[in-house]
């Protein structure tokens, strides 16, 4: 005999009741209180991300790194981007105590970092200029690669402070959830396009 859909959703929500992380050196933390979903069986399986016209949030089905909405508690103001590099999630804090959560790829061992920056510029289908130290490690890289579907920066880029780091798309979506980059935060193209449309230059970004 199968489990009732509503009970299944309750179990999923309880499984993710309290997840939290903090970075004492900058006082950053974010507590995930749970997914926001609805019990109807058909909608329970729907891969619908975000808010519907009726104001209801849906639980995203599929990959654990699919875009979804979660309840959160954070000292940071709405509109802040908070990135949990250990769990490979990026959160965009909302006004109503929720956050849009996206899966990300992060820096590989030796290329991890943490801090607080602001978005200083934005670009659609950005060109890629691999820094000299990267080309020294990987001599086959070009000096410049024009923007496009094969460009490692993907569909959008959000540049962080005066650093070389960006939040950007990717031509390798299978790397989301992994630590493979040189320090940049990578997202699926459809996710970085969504995030790009929601944030402005000056947005605070907390990485821990």
Named regions from a protein language model:
Residues 1-21:
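N-terminal secretory signal peptides that target proteins for export/translocation
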Residues 38-43:
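Sec/Tat signal peptide C-region and signal peptidase I cleavage site
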Residues 44-47, 55-170, 194:
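Gly/Pro-biased beta-strand-loop elements
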Residues 22-37:
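Bacterial N-terminal signal peptides
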Residues 182-196:
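Short beta-strand-centered segments at strand-helix junctions
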């Amino acid at each position: 005999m199968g489990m009732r859909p509503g009970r299944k959703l309750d179990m999923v929500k309880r499984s993710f009741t309290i997840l939290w992380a903090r970075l004492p050196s900058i006082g950053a933390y974010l507590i995930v209180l749970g997914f926001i979903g609805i019990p109807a069986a058909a909608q329970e399986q729907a891969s619908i991300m975000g808010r519907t016209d009726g104001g209801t949030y849906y639980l995203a089905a599929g990959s654990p790194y699919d875009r979804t909405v979660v309840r959160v508690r954070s000292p940071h103001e709405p509109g802040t981007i908070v990135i949990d590099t250990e769990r490979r999630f990026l959160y965009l804090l909302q006004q109503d105590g929720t956050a849009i959560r996206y899966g990300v790829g992060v820096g590989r061992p030796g290329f991890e970092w943490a801090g607080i920056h602001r978005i200083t510029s934005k670009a659609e289908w950005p060109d890629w200029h691999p820094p000299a130290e990267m080309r020294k490690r990987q001599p086959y890289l070009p000096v410049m690669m024009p923007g496009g579907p094969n460009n490692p920066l993907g569909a959008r880029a959000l540049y962080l402070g005066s650093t070389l780091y960006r939040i950007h798309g990717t031509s390798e979506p299978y790397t989301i959830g992994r630590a493979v980059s040189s320090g940049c935060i990578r997202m699926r193209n459809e996710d970085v396009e969504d995030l790009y449309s929601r944030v402005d230059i000056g947005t605070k970004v907390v990485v821990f």
